[in-house]
Amino acid sequence: MKKTIKIIIITLIIAIALELSAIVAIKAYHLVNEATKTDAKEVTHKNDKKQAKNTDKNVDIPKPSSKISSDIPEKPVLGPVDATYFDDAVFLGDSRTVGLRAFGDFHNSSYFAKTGISVNSFFMYPALDEETGLTLTQTLSYKQYKKIYIMIGVNDAALVPLETFETQFFDAIREIQLLQPEAIIYVQSILGVTKNKELSDPYHYSNERVVERNNLLKSKCDGEKLVYLDVFSAFTDAEGYLNQFNSSDGLHLNSSDYDIWCDYLTQHALPVN
């Protein structure tokens, strides 16, 4: 009898233990399931955030324009003009400009030109124009010009250092600007000499020095109130000298070739209001 009761009690204890184990297992299952769902939600939320960030990265954000505003005026461009453009111009220079006055096409222009003149002769020594007898100061004081063309520097290219030429030339330019504040100043490149001329008189003439001076002049011009014109390029040979076919004496242009100079100028001018 007692054995039977013990067996029944043990059986009940085992049954209760099994039931408790089942309950614990079920609760554990539910807890794990809930945790899994929570983790899944968090992962989904994080993925959504990442996707949102990636989407933001892919959005085309307007960038500042690299183009200059069209309101800023561009520098004027050199272009063709007719001969009347030079009616209110004055040409300043040495014997080459004397030749331009004699054989060129700009008959209504004014001139200040003297054979053998150099940069320091412009204002330091009162050189007189060969035709009018006026000094440069007088020429520029009597009338206001719209354009001023200057070519000078070959006569002392082999003698005067580049630094001295620079000082003298741009001192002259400043004086001209004071007398003619509204004028466009065209700085024409200095015409060189032929190879034979340089070889026959290297003490006075140096084509290499002329090229150095032209490079200097070009670097100092702003393209607006001080405009560089590479006239020499219209007359150079393959070696960079003045072409012998354009100059019988190696220094001055043939009378029939001044029209090349004039043609170059009419094709390279700034518009004037």
Give each language-model segment a name.
Residues 151, 188-189:
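Alpha/beta-hydrolase-fold catalytic nucleophile elbow
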Residues 1-7:
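Positively charged n-region of N-terminal signal peptides that target proteins for export
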Residues 26-88:
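N-terminal, intrinsically disordered, polar/charged segments of Gram-positive cell-envelope systems
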Residues 169-173, 214:
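Generic structural signal for well-ordered alpha-helices
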Residues 10-23:
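Hydrophobic membrane-insertion alpha-helices, especially the h-region
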Residues 180-184:
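A short helix->loop->beta-strand "cap" motif at the edges of active sites that frequently abuts
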Residues 79-168:
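Conserved SGNH/GDSL esterase-like catalytic core that processes O-acyl groups on lipids
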Residues 26, 193-273:
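Catalytic His-Asp segment of secreted/periplasmic serine-dependent ester chemistry enzymes
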